[in-house]
């Protein structure tokens, strides 16, 4: 029997993958489904006739054409390959299996499209994954109900940035990548550009925090200096306006240092009725340096962890917080949630 060219067997295998996997979740018309089933049957017959030439990865175990799609876009084989790629590339044993719902202190989570390192012509290049940033580990699952991760990597030593060259469709501005020298590059696509930038911001902040290189305030945050410092800077210029043409014109009053909407000083510190070690919703971190102007104001630096005891003065824009045993009021605009629950 004449041998079948390798290019032909590869084409047939890719076509089989396209019909059984890629079109599996598509909403096809009745006529299109009949055509698809007919092609699958013909491919099966051809591969049976040339069993020696075809190395059938599925061992002729074809799924039923109308089988319900229980996957998120990729076949079971491709999902296993996704995990195998991790081991083969990094050369280290993976972390112990952990269920998505068992993760604690998650900084950021949600669905992303993850780009596969290797994919066939008809295979899915992007796979929907539920991702979670937990301490220094980036986990990805098939869904938020999975009992075991499909893969994970430690973000220490990596850098993260937006990348609009990964796709050419409407989501080209929604992509970002996490990379490091001599390590695998992980590429993701979010549902929107805003969501992608939030992921980049959280990952970048955590990488710098773990490396102890959170930058000091830059020029773009100059407007966050305390009002007292700003006032001192303009005091020398006030002399220019002291000479007025008429004596009966009143001198302009200087702006007050304290905020107009500042609440009254808090009474006896409120004691938390919950366990602080597990009350993740009330843990925040400083976005910028904040120097308190009054004794009842809490001073903190960017990246400092603050536990919020009370939001009694939320309408004024202030909360009652505690940091290192010191209690005081803090402006809520200067804070960012430490954990995403």
Swiss-Prot record:
GO terms for biological process: B cell activation. Phosphorylated on tyrosines. The keyword Hydrolase does not apply. Its main location: cytoplasm. InterPro entries: PH-like_dom_sf (IPR011993), PH_domain (IPR001849), SH3-like_dom_sf (IPR036028), SH3_domain (IPR001452), SKAP_fam (IPR037781). It comes from the Eukaryota. Pfam families: PH, SH3_1. It is found in: Cytoplasm. Belongs to the SKAP family. This is Src kinase-associated phosphoprotein 2.
């Amino acid at each position: 029997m004449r041998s079948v060219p390798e290019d032909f067997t590869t084409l047939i295998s890719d076509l089989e993958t396209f019909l059984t996997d890629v079109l599996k979740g598509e909403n096809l018309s009745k006529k299109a489904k009949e055509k698809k089933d007919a092609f699958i049957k013909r491919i099966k017959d051809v591969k049976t006739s040339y069993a020696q030439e075809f190395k059938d990865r599925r061992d002729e175990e074809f799924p039923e054409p109308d089988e319900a799609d229980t996957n998120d876009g990729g076949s079971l084989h491709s999902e296993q390959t996704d995990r195998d790629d991790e081991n083969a590339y990094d050369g280290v044993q993976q972390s112990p299996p952990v269920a998505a719902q068992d993760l604690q202190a998650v900084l950021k989570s949600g669905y992303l499209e993850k780009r596969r390192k290797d994919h066939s012509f008809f295979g899915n290049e992007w796979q929907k994954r539920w991702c979670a940033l937990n301490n220094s580990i980036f986990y990805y699952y098939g869904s938020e109900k999975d009992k075991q991760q499909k893969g994970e990597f430690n973000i220490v030593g990596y850098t993260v940035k937006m990348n609009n060259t990964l796709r050419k469709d409407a989501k080209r501005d929604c992509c970002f990548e996490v990379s490091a020298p001599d390590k695998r590059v992980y590429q993701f696509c979010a549902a929107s550009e805003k969501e992608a930038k939030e992921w980049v911001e959280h990952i970048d902040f955590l990488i710098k925090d773990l490396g102890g290189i959170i930058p000091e305030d830059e020029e773009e945050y100059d407007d966050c200096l305390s009002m007292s410092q700003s006032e001192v800077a303009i005091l020398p210029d006030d002399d220019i306006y002291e000479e007025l043409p008429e004596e009966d014109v009143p001198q302009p009053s200087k702006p007050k240092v304290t905020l107009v909407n500042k609440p009254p000083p808090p009474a006896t510190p409120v004691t938390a009725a919950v366990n602080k070690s597990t009350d993740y919703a009330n843990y925040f971190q400083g976005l910028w340096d904040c120097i308190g102007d009054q004794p009842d104001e809490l001073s903190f630096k960017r990246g400092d962890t603050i536990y919020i005891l009370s939001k009694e003065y939320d309408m004024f824009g202030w909360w009652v917080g505690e940091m290192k045993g010191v209690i005081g009021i803090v402006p809520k605009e200067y804070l960012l949630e430490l954990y995403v629950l």
